[in-house]
Amino acid sequence: MSRVLAFDFGASSGRAILGAYENGELSYREVHRFENNPRDKDGHFRWDFEDLLANVRLGAQKAGPVDSLAFDTWGVDFGLLDSQGRLLEDPVHYRDQRTAGLVEEAFQSLPAGALYGATGTQILNINSLYQLLALQRQEPQLWEKAHRLLFMPDLFAWALCGAQACETTIASTSQLLDPCSQSWSQQVLSAFHIPQELFAPLVKSGTVVGEYQGAKVIAAAGHDTQCAVAAMPAPEKDAAFLSCGTWSLLGCEREAPIL
């Protein structure tokens, strides 16, 4: 029997789900649920990363021995490490107001059509691109110290096993990834003076990145919506999905992006 542990983070709470696969059947149950309470700190609205990480460890303890574990969260948010591999600050939450006005400013460097064509990502001021532009303009000293960016699912994995990896589904929410080549968009990085070295190596969903207390730490589909779509009980072709949470996303699966 295989035992796996999934940590799912929503806007108001997180949960640890223990799954078991035996004789061709999957069963699962919630072993731990906890509040996700972002807070105002140091001039920004932030994730309470220390508290959430403590609940991750508690969830793993409640689950007992497992073969593997993984994380999913919403997209766009990230943490920054310095050159010594230390978290520089609590990650800023997408509901923070630091990106106000930056979408229009960004169009001066790369017009909307070109930006969408390069990334296929809906242009929203919460996207990681605009969060990085805010960092460049408003906190240049912090920007200079930033050595590595890890999106939130990868940041939790790093905190448990030390691995620095960037899973592609969560990277796709950043407005920095080329969906056709599944690599960073050189056009976008160049236009906004973002060094590619800031990002950890891209890995595909399902990659084993490390180990925590004897369990494999897996970079699953880190973006919660894409994680849900992957598990959707639907035909392989000609199926649409409507994923409803804090907001709703409508889409369909295709062999290649439509841009």
Stretches found by the model and what they are:
Residues F9-A11, L115-T225:
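Gly/Ser/Thr-rich active-site cleft segment
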Residues M1-E89, G117, K145, A200, ...:
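N-terminal glycine/serine-rich phosphate-binding loop of ATP-dependent small-molecule kinases
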Residues D48, L69, D96, L135, ...:
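Residue-level signal for inorganic ion chemistry
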Residues P38-R39, A100-G101, V208-G210:
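A short acidic, often aromatic-flanked loop/helix-cap motif at beta-alpha or helix-coil junctions
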Residues Q108-A112:
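Conserved FAD-binding subdomain of flavin-dependent enzymes
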Residues F78-S83, L87-A106, A146, L150-W184, ...:
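Glycine-rich phosphate-binding loop of actin/hexokinase-like ATP-binding domains
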Residues G14, T73, L129, C227-V229:
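Short glycine/serine/threonine-rich phosphate/pyrophosphate-binding segments
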Residues R57-G64, Q136, A157, A230-A231:
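Generic structural signal for well-ordered alpha-helical scaffold segments
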